């Protein structure tokens, strides 16, 4: 009986897995130039076309980067490199995937706020308070929302986990638009948001991680419920 030739997609996926394993195990270091497409294909025992597709896919994902006239390099991955990927995923999500992302955001935001309560410096707490006061003093939705985002960014930064902050930043683009719509469509939405933010700030000032976690979960949960019942077009 003749053996069935492997599907091209399967071969390409195997190449992707092999390259990522080489990076994970330190065989290819961040910033290092990849061997030529031909040499890498021979090394992994696959066709050049499958190798080309694997490299293209990893470049789109940000794992590899093409430098004109120089070759393909392993990206020097930093926490901030997660921003664009998570932002695109958040923007394109619908249905079940959106619901799952909202759950992820609620868990991460609550955890980040709890960490911030334990780690926040007086300077960082003052910055959070500045944005809270600016929200209270503002009347325009756009200005309020700008300080809203800055409020959450300051808390994420105070948590001291750059990767968590990067993921949360990437997940905020959809939430930003949702807050705009919520502010325009629901009477009293901004007042509720102000109260929720004040509760978070009080917990941070008290250096109470569990109170901070609960306040953040309640705040994000309100936005989450609103998004669940009013999906974007």
Give the residues covered by each predicted segment.
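Short linear motifs at protein or domain termini
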Residues: 1-108, 114
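Cytosolic histidine kinase catalytic core of two-component systems
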Residues: 123, 162-163
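Short, hydrophobic secondary-structure boundary micro-motifs
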Residues: 30-32, 165-168, 213
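Short loop-to-helix capping motifs
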Residues: 160-162, 207-208
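All-alpha effector-binding/dimerization core of bacterial HTH-type transcriptional repressors
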Residues: 79-154, 192-214
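Amphipathic alpha-helical segments in well-ordered regions
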Residues: 18, 111, 115, 154, ...
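C-terminal all-alpha effector/ligand-binding and dimerization domain
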Residues: 20, 132, 136, 150-152, ...
